[in-house]
Every structure is written in C-alpha cells, then in structure tokens.
C-alpha cells in the first residue's frame, strides 16, 4: 500500500507487493495497480469466488422461500372462490417468472423469456383479487393501473411510465424492490383499437397506448422522477429496469365470446345448411372464453405485438348464484365475516340466514356486478342498524333474512333477557 510494501531488488528496481495477501510481484502472475494500492490475480480470483458463493446462497435462499405452484394455489383458494383453471395457470406462470429471475444469476447459455399474463373474465369475477393475493403471498411491491387513463407521451393524461412511478411509491422508492414487483393493468380491453385495420388517424388512448406499453411490458429501462416529482430537463431520474417486473393485464373483453364462436363456426352464416341454435343451447360464456386464441384477441382490437408480449392467457368463468353465496361466506376475509367482526366489536352477534345469502347473490346477478357488488348490497341493508346500534343498549343479536335483503322488513333485533328483579322493578 505504502512505501513499506515496496523494496528494491539487487538491480535497484522497486519490488511491489499485493496490499491484500502480501505476496511480491515475483510470486504472482499479475499485480494490478490502483490509487496507492495493489492487488494480485490470486486475490482477484478469490474475490470472484466469494461473490459467486454469495450469489449462489442468495439464489438458494430465494428458491427455498419461493412457494411452489401447489402452495400458491392453496393460498389463492383461501381468498378466491372457484376459477380453478385461472388459478392453476397463474400459479405456474408466477412460479416460472420468479424462477427465471433466479436463473439470471447463473452462467447459463439459455435465457428464459419473460411471460406476462393476460386475465380475461367478466366484471367482478376476481381478476384484481387474484393479482393482489399473489403479490401479498410473494411479499413483493404491487400496484394497479387503469388502462383507460393512459395516453401516449405528449398527450393529456397519464404516461405509461407513471405506472412504474406508482410501483416505486409502494416500496418507498427502493429501485431494487420495485424491479421485482407486480403490476396489474386493469381495463386493458378498453384500449383496443376501433377496427382491425391499422388506423391512419392518431388513436392516443387505444392503439397508441398499446404501442407505448410494448417496451415497458417486454423490458426496458424507464426514467422516473424521484419521489413523485414532475419531469423537467435538469432533474436526475431514477432508472428502473422493467425486465423482471411481472405485468398482469386484465379485462372483461365484452363480446370476445362472439368473436371466438364466429371463428368456431358456431354462430352466424347464411343459407339452408346453417344450424339454428335455440337460446337453451347457448353455450356458457366462460367455456367459450376458455377456447380463446391470439387471433381472437387481435380481431377484438389488440395489436399483434401486444398480444405477443402476453403469452400466458388465463380465462375466468362468470360467477353463478352458488359461487356468489360461497364468496359471501367462505374466503378468509369473506364479506359476512367482516360484518360479523364489526358487530362483534359492539358485543352483538350478527346472523345471516341462508335465504338472505341467496337473495344477496340473486341481486348481484341481476345488477351484473359479479362479486364486486356483494358488499354494496350488504352495506345498504345494514346501514341503519350500524348507525343506531352504538347508541342502543341491551341488543345481543341482529338477524338478516331474505325479506330484509328484499327491503320488505328491517333487520331483526334480539334483546338480552333482563333479570327477574329488574323486570319486576325491585
């Protein structure tokens, strides 16, 4: 390092020594000089070995903490009712995505491609909940973006890079954490182009947004202002590499089933040879969507390049009355469990009769809101009771049946039995 690590040979030349192991330049193959320090090739090799071992340990630790597809499915089952096909697809896709990130630390000739996910299913079928549950299970940053608010850069609206800014905000601007997060882009079907043919005029909220999202989804280095500041030329930007961010896009894709049926020659046509299908033989929308092909999505209005960036497609079924009743009662954070907990805090028991649950499910089906509308229905029914309850005494139980859900009667209030002495006035 200093002069004491240098000496002179018999011929008067200085002999240099490695600042780390102390070997002279004559004992090693190569001595690399730095600002007032030297390091030999043997120490460089040793440092490389240490770093390699640490990376391997980190990789093994990540691999052991990464839940397997069956374990992912078990957790999803606790929060999302039904949708087994979609849950299995997601479990495998997410597991493979994070395995792919691990493999990047290894010196491997084969580079695994990124597999982003497209969720296709009716409103309120559980698309957002699936993405949220996955992020919570994997303990990674998660954000939701609405595709309908996005526009091309330079137009009024949100730039696609704002999505990454939201993700950074969720993890206190820790770039390393954000680069392994999950982004859910909702209403992706709303940015489909208006016709199959490429548009001559500018479509800033449709095809233009798809084009803008391409690089972000595939993997690019996005420049994001720190701490949510606005962009200006003199500002330093945070550089976020999106190649390891998992993008999940979701949409209802209303009318996609007709596109699929048309391709399968099940609907339409002119002439005597055409089979006329009655309304009774109409196929279930969920089963039709399960047969979706990339060409159907392109015909619907997604550009081919965008479809290519979403190789994993999971379809969700429309929820029926039975599924909605299960959603009300079975998940870990089921709506009825949440309201029971609220009433429990007032030392009151809340009971939902079976006919009440069925009535709530029927109402949600009628409104075509899926599982999303269940909470609103229950909230409205119990609103007056929750308003009065904290001010009333002696209530031990509240009962809700079908007539209450159908607004034919108020929730039934059951009072505690008063002791005989109190009742007689003694």
From Swiss-Prot:
UniProt record, GO biological process: cell division; proteolysis involved in protein catabolic process
Pfam families to which the protein is assigned, alphabetical: AAA_2, ClpB_D2-small, zf-C4_ClpX
Annotated disulfide bonds: none
Keywords for this protein: ATP-binding, Chaperone, Metal-binding, Nucleotide-binding, Zinc
InterPro entries linked to this entry: AAA+_ATPase (IPR003593), ATP-dep_Clp_protease_ClpX (IPR050052), ATPase_AAA_core (IPR003959), Clp_ATPase_C (IPR019489), Clp_protease_ATP-bd_su_ClpX (IPR004487), ClpX_bact (IPR046425), P-loop_NTPase (IPR027417), Znf_CppX_C4 (IPR010603)
Function: ATP-dependent specificity component of the Clp protease. It directs the protease to specific substrates. Can perform chaperone functions in the absence of ClpP.
Record-stated family: Belongs to the ClpX chaperone family.
Record text on subunit structure and interactions: Component of the ClpX-ClpP complex. Forms a hexameric ring that, in the presence of ATP, binds to fourteen ClpP subunits assembled into a disk-like structure with a central cavity, resembling the structure of eukaryotic proteasomes.
The protein, known as: ATP-dependent Clp protease ATP-binding subunit ClpX
Organism placement in taxonomy: Bacteria, Pseudomonadati, Pseudomonadota, Gammaproteobacteria, Lysobacterales
């Amino acid at each position: 390092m200093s002069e004491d690590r240098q000496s002179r040979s018999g011929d008067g030349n200085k002999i240099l020594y490695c600042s780390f192991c102390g070997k002279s330049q004559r004992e090693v193959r190569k001595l690399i000089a730095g600002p007032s320090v030297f390091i030999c090739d043997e120490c460089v090799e040793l440092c490389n070995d240490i770093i390699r071992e640490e990376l391997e340990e980190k990789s093994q630790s990540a691999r052991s903490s990464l839940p397997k597809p069956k374990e992912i499915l078990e957790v999803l089952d606790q929060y999302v009712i039904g949708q087994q096909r979609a849950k299995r697809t997601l479990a495998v896709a997410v597991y493979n995505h994070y395995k792919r990130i691990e493999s990047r630390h290894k010196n491997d000739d084969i580079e695994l491609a990124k597999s982003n996910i497209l969720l296709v299913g009716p409103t309120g079928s559980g698309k957002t909940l699936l993405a949220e549950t996955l992020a919570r299970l994997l303990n990674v940053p998660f954000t939701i973006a609405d595709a309908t608010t996005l526009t091309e850069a330079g137009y009024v609206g949100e730039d696609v890079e704002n999505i990454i800014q939201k993700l950074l905000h969720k993890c206190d601007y820790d770039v390393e954490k954000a680069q392994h997060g999950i982004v859910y882009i909702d209403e992706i079907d709303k940015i489909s182009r208006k016709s199959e043919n490429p548009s001559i005029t500018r479509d800033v909220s449709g095809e233009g947004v798809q084009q803008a999202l391409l690089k972000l989804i595939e993997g690019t280095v996005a420049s994001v202002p720190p701490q949510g500041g606005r962009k200006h030329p003199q500002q330093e930007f945070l550089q976020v590499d999106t190649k390891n961010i998992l993008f999940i896009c979701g949409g209802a894709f209303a009318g996609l089933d007709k596109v699929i049926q048309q391709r399968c020659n099940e609907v339409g046509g002119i002439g005597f040879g055409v089979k006329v299908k009655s309304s009774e033989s109409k196929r279930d929308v969920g089963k039709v969507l399960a047969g979706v092909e990339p060409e159907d999505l392109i015909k619907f209005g997604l550009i081919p390049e965008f479809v290519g960036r979403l190789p994993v497609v999971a379809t969700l079924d429309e929820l029926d009355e039975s599924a909605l009743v299960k959603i009300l009662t079975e998940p870990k954070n089921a709506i009825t469990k949440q309201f029971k907990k609220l009433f429990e805090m007032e030392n009151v028991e809340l009971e939902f009769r079976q006919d009440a649950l069925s009535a709530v499910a029927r109402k949600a089906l009628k409104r075509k809101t899926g599982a999303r509308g269940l909470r609103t229905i229950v909230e409205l029914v119990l609103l007056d009771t929750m308003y009065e309850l904290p001010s009333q005494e002696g209530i031990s139980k509240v009962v809700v049946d079908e007539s209450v859900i159908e607004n034919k009667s108020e929730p039934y209030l059951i009072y505690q039995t008063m002791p005989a002495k109190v009742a007689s006035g003694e």
